[in-house]
Amino acid sequence: MKLLEDRIKKDGEVLDGDVLKINSFLNHQVDPQLMMQCGEEFKRLFADQKIDKVLTCEASGIAPGVMTAYVLDVPMVFARKKKPSTLNDAVYWADVFSYTKKVNNKICVEEKLLHKGENLLIIDDFVAQGEAVKGMVNIAKQAECNIVGVGAVVAKTFQGGSDWVKQHGLHFEALASIDSFKDGQVHFGKEN
Amino acid sequence: MKLLEDRIKKDGEVLDGDVLKINSFLNHQVDPQLMMQCGEEFKRLFADQKIDKVLTCEASGIAPGVMTAYVLDVPMVFARKKKPSTLNDAVYWADVFSYTKKVNNKICVEEKLLHKGENLLIIDDFVAQGEAVKGMVNIAKQAECNIVGVGAVVAKTFQGGSDWVKQHGLHFEALASIDSFKDGQVHFGKEN
């Protein structure tokens, strides 16, 4: 998605450790028009699939997730990183390993929000090692849902997450695929 | 907003301790069409104001916040509850007291995302005691922004948060104002 690549080139910051900071339009400040365009692009890329629900993860997945759900006219569920006090019903849990902090965190989704046989599109803002996606796939499988695909706004294809998704037979689409940060610059691949 | 009140009556669950759980369309599963309608209603209610940016708080504020920003055609910033590893620049911090857990949590916004003199519309999903709103007002003041108003998707008007906002001279709007949960039922006030 050229619009997104151009924006990453213009506003993204490459930090040490192959980290891309895009706080000005995705991860802290959000450009809602761009998020809507991402949603429309996901709709186009998964147009051959029946989608009943979008599954994403708080916090940065919510903006692209809700816009994708809006254009698909389906509900969106966001996995929570803590079980809130109002979450008094049974939940599905999954581990999400944090490479930054070297600890297992957990995400959860209330059981009654996912139904057996439902067709889920998983949306994430960033797929690097793909730990959040692995957690969402785990939860979708516990709920016996069908995963119609995984859509990433940005994928760092050299960190294994996108390969993991494809190796598990899932349809993977990234709106911007980053191959490397050689010389402190963002280098895009051909997948978008 | 009658559509929202009807939805709360239909799908909301009143729990002990004057807690309203609306996980099926706002706080865990999200109805994106309803969120867009909330955004349009906030635009109408604050139509007399110049708005440069929407400020909200992760996680449940993001969906109504980004839809409001979409219809206003302005950026949205969500305050973070933890400082992420990529947030390497200076941030504004504010305390947010948790009545459930009796502890002070913190929220933060990167300084360079808020500019002196900018006109901010603060959006929150739920205003009860209003602690998250107080934190966002605090941050907006640190940044020397103008607060053009505070919009709540749902306000529990008997818990003080909406009064606090008005007592501080701020324009307050709630799309659904709950006066009480007498007899385990949701009773709406006249403000919406």
Swiss-Prot record, chains A, B:
One of its GO terms (cellular component) is cytoplasm. Belongs to the purine/pyrimidine phosphoribosyltransferase family. Xpt subfamily. 5-phospho-alpha-D-ribose 1-diphosphate binds at residues 128-132. This is Xanthine phosphoribosyltransferase. NCBIfam families: PRK09219.1 (NF006671), XPRTase (TIGR01744). Pathway: Purine metabolism; XMP biosynthesis via salvage pathway; XMP from xanthine: step 1/1. GO terms for biological process: purine ribonucleoside salvage; xanthine metabolic process; XMP salvage. Converts the preformed base xanthine, a product of nucleic acid breakdown, to xanthosine 5'-monophosphate (XMP), so it can be reused for RNA or DNA synthesis. It comes from Lactobacillus helveticus (strain DPC 4571). Pfam families: Pribosyltran (PF00156).
